[in-house]
């Protein structure tokens, strides 16, 4: 293939540049770019840059300036000092020619940027760059840098600069500090950028003074003023970086603060001035002096500011108006501590805080119209945090605190008004992003109100209770009522019994009857907000059972609303679970209510699941097992009907399929009905779980008799098992059915006894029906893990048989993936977790160690070691946990056969484990895995006397994954690990060694 010929003349290069800026095929443009880049980077690039800048075309000139930039970035280190000075003069010379010939700003700005690039590479030899560039522009020629010694004062030079050259200096100066400010800290120190830039601060202040302060009375070019303000902003932000990096304060800049602020009333300069001071207040308020803040206070009190503020509050959300609001908020953020502490004595603070409260009440809906509300809420969150900090850090309540509380209460009242939903037709007309943002803003208000309770206490609760009662009196103020209820629900974590008198007013009001109306005038949002209140105060209903019937009647009436059924059923379940004991006398009514729901088929399936779980929790609270039997039978009859309906539908669907008959429209699929039945069983199982705070009866008999497993209650278990078995057989390839059946069993596996605490062999039968091909078999393995935990709690010999059979089943899954964890990580992880749970109880060790055939046991151990060296994080984590437990097994097992088996296993597997751990720590593991992998290493060192020799052999093995560490470093690592004897510091040593093996710059030997 012939080598592509590069252009040999300047005209050819110019032609290529012109082609580049014309629309053309992407391939052609890419090829031109590639050719031009080769030319730019070639040794002739310097000459090319000069040639292109001599063109009459703006595009070609721009490309010439770009070529200088590229050459500086690629070849600056090869330039001698004299050559570098020549390049500087050439670039300045071209800038002067461009300005004199009236070039457009694109080329002038590019040349200014190129000069900044030059400074970044040669800052030491061009320290007073602004003074030198200004002198050259005034002279109209590029003179050597050392000639600035002959230059007049900067004030004289600045006064003699025409506007176009002033703009060039401003562009260069702003870009200079912006680019230096982007430099990382190491480069900043290495190149001493701060040291050199600081030498220019008085020079730039002189230039800026000309553009910002009108000392002559002659009108200043608007463009020069705007660019002066932008440049001033860049230098102020850079001064913040200089202060943070090196405690450098650029005091001369502060002389411009007040003159710059005065420009805010100039319409042409308003936008840049507001942006500048909002930026300073938000990011570097310490730049401003006390006098500057006084001037800002005066500004916000002026008629100009009052007019701006009034426009914003009246619903003008144009960019400039919102900018003013942001400016006011930035001032509030910067002075928030003073505002809070001076509120009771300083009229200026009162005025500012009053204005900040007002920002929360601007006309218009949040987000859709009102663009200042969300940042205003953020300010009040900062205000609250500040007041809390100031008031909690003193011994006595400060005198300003009541006034600070009062203004916060005013802010919250404004928030309450604004958080009310628009009319439904209005809200639905917004786009999805606006609706989501509106709801986010409401959550922000909720957070503010919740946190405010820490400062305002019960008076805040009382205020929302009063608002609720007023809305109830009005009868149809649904938006107000919804907002008030939503706010009241926020206090659930902060108020307890002391709030009962306020909640009495709410729950004793006509609110229940209002919201239980059968007509459609009550918005679903208002009902849902009341649900949130009920959910938030379950302990209240335990103390005030007289309100329980009203609450439950309301909830049951809401079950028929498609939009509220799911959340309502969950609320019913939560309330019944919390108040289960007091609801026992109402159990018959609940069963009757559920019977009607089932008969009418009037609610969604998920609503049935919630309600049936609620009833089960009431059954759990009955005084003895015998009393639970009949109501449980009634509950299971409902489930049985759904199950039988599913089987009937399934047979009908088979018949239709055989005869090519279409399934009738609207008919529910058989599997959906079956899933509803199984999920109802899950809800029943969860409802029957004994609450965690129930006292343990220490006098319970330790015999193995169980009413549910051995007595009259066994019929309940048999019925459930029959339903689950039939479902499993009817839908053998249905992963969701398999998963939900697993969940049913797991609800009982956490219980010591109960209707759903099945004998282990019953659960095992379900597990053994599954194999590697079973959809969602992972959930079945997890059930096996739960079952092994349950078996570990008793000494029953039958449990040992079940555990042994489960181990055989799990080993079969490992065999199905060819004993390679990477073939199916999702299967591997829970399988290894099963092994870990099996050995977590010493009495089960013999089950693992006596597993037959021995080849299968060896495969099991090797499977975990392969997972340990694999790339899949979850199996690796489980394997690390397994080995951390296995190597630290007690050495005094009373069963000598088991003890000998442990010893033999570790003698054979210890070196392999050490090799796997060292392989990971030698760089093969991910950094996030190191802490977990350090656990078996620490246990190995503590518990195994041969650990050092095993680890040393692994470090010296040919399979060690890194060549970045030598033998000496490996031995240092081993010595540190052994000396730590399993202490937590091992993790740090492992991390350091891993870094060294990865080839980082970390100096390991220290």
Which residues does each predicted region cover?
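Karyopherin-beta/Importin-beta family HEAT-repeat alpha-solenoid scaffold
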Residues: 2-1006
């Amino acid at each position: 293939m012939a080598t592509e010929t590069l252009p040999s003349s300047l005209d050819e290069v110019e032609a290529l540049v012109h082609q580049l800026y014309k629309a053309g095929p992407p391939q052609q443009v890419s090829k031109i770019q590639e050719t031009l880049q080769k030319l730019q980077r070639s040794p002739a690039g310097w000459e090319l840059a000069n040639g292109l800048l001599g063109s009459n075309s703006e595009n070609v000139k721009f490309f010439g300036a770009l070529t200088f930039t590229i050459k500086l970035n690629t070849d600056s280190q090869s330039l001698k000092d004299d050559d570098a000075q020549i390049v500087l003069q050439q670039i300045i010379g071209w800038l002067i020619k461009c300005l004199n010939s009236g070039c457009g700003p694109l080329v002038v700005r590019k040349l200014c940027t190129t000069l900044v690039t030059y400074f970044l590479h040669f800052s030491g030899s061009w320290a007073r760059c602004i003074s030198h560039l200004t002198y050259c522009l005034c002279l109209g020629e590029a003179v050597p840098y050392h000639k600035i010694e002959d230059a007049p004062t900067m004030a004289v030079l600045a006064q003699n600069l025409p506007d176009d050259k002033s703009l060039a200096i401003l562009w260069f100066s702003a870009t200079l500090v912006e680019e230096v400010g982007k430099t990382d800290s190491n480069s900043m120190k290495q190149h001493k950028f701060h040291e050199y830039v600081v030498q220019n601060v008085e020079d730039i202040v002189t230039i800026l003074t000309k553009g910002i302060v009108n000392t002559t009375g002659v009108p200043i070019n608007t463009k020069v003023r705007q660019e002066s303000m932008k440049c001033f902003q860049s230098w102020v932000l850079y001064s913040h970086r200089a202060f943070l990096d090196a405690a450098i304060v650029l005091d001369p800049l502060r002389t411009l603060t007040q003159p710059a602020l005065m420009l805010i009333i100039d319409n042409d300069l308003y936008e840049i001035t507001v942006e500048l001071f909002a930026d300073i207040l938000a990011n570097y308020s310490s730049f401003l002096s006390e006098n500057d803040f006084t001037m800002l206070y005066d500004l916000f009190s002026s008629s100009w500011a009052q007019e701006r503020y009034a426009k914003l509050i009246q619903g003008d959300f144009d960019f400039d108006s919102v900018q003013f609001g942001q400016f006011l908020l930035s001032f509030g953020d910067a002075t928030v501590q003073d505002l809070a502490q001076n509120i009771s004595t300083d009229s200026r603070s009162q005025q500012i805080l009053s204005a900040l409260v007002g920002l929360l009440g601007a006309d218009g809906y949040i987000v859709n119209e009102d663009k200042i509300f969300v940042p205003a809420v953020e300010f009040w969150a900062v205000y609250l945090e500040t007041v809390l900090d100031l008031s909690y850090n003193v011994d006595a309540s400060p005198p300003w605190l009541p006034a600070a509380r009062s203004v916060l209460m005013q802010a919250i009242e404004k928030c309450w008004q604004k958080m009310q939903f628009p009319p439904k037709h209005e809200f639905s007309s917004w786009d999805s992003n606006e609706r989501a943002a509106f709801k986010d803003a409401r959550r922000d208000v909720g957070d503010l109100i919740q946190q405010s309770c820490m400062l305002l206490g019960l008076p805040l609760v009382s205020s929302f209770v009063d608002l609720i009662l007023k809305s109830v009196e009005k009868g149809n103020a649904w938006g107000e009522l919804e907002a008030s209820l939503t706010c009241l629900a926020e206090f659930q974590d902060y108020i307890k019994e002391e709030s009962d008198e306020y909640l009495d007013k709410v729950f004793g009001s006509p609110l229940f009857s209002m919201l239980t109306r059968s007509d459609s005038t009550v918005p679903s949002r208002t009902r849902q907000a009341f649900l949130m209140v009920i959910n938030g105060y379950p302990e209240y209903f335990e103390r005030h059972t007289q309100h329980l019937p009203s609450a439950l009647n309301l909830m049951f009436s809401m079950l028929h609303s498609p939009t509220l059924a799911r959340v309502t059923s969950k609320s019913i379940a939560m309330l019944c679970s919390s108040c289960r004991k007091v609801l026992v006398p109402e159990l018959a009514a609940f069963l009757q209510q559920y019977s009607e729901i089932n008969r009418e088929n009037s609610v969604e399936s998920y609503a049935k699941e919630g309600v049936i779980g609620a009833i089960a929790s009431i059954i759990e609270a009955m005084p003895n097992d015998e009393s639970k039997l009949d109501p449980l039978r009634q509950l299971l009859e409902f489930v049985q009907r759904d199950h039988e309906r599913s089987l009937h539908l399934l047979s009908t669907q088979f018949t239709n399929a055989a005869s090519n008959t279409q399934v009738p429209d609207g008919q529910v699929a058989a599997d959906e009905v079956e899933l509803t039945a199984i999920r109802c069983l899950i809800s029943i199982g969860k409802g029957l779980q004994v609450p965690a705070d129930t006292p343990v009866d220490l006098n319970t008999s330790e015999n193995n008799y169980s009413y549910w497993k051995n007595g009259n209650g066994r019929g309940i278990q048999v019925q459930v098992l029959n339903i689950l078995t039939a479902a499993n057989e009817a839908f053998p390839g249905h992963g969701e059915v398999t998963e939900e059946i697993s969940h049913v069993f797991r609800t009982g596996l956490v219980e010591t006894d109960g209707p759903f605490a099945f004998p282990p062999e019953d659960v095992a039968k379900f597990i053994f029906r599954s194999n590697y091909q079973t959809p969602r078999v992972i959930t079945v393995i997890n059930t096996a893990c739960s079952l092994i935990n349950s078996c570990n709690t008793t000494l029953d010999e039958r449990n040992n048989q079940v555990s042994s059979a489960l181990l055989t089943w799990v080993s079969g899954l490992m065999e199905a993936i060819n004993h390679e964890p990477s073939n199916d990580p999702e299967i591997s992880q829970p399988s290894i977790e099963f092994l870990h749970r099996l050995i977590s109880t010493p009495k089960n060790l013999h089950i693992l160690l006596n597993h037959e055939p021995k080849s299968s046991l060896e495969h099991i151990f090797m499977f975990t070691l392969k997972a340990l060296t694999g790339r899949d994080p979850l199996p690796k984590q489980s394997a690390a946990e397994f080995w951390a437990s296995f190597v630290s097994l007690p050495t005094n097992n009373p069963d000598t056969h088991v003890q000998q088996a442990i010893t033999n296993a570790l003698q054979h597997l210890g070196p392999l484990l050490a090799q796997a751990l060292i392989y990971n720590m030698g760089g093969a593991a991910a950094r996030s895995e190191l802490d977990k992998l350090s656990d078996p290493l620490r246990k190995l060192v503590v518990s195994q006397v041969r650990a050092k020799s095993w680890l040393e052999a692994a470090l010296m093995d040919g399979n060690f994954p890194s060549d970045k560490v030598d033998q000496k470093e490996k031995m240092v690592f081993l010595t540190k690990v052994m000396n730590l004897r399993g202490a937590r510091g091992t993790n740090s040593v492992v991390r350091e060694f891993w870094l060294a093996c990865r080839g980082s710059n970390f100096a390991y030997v220290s």
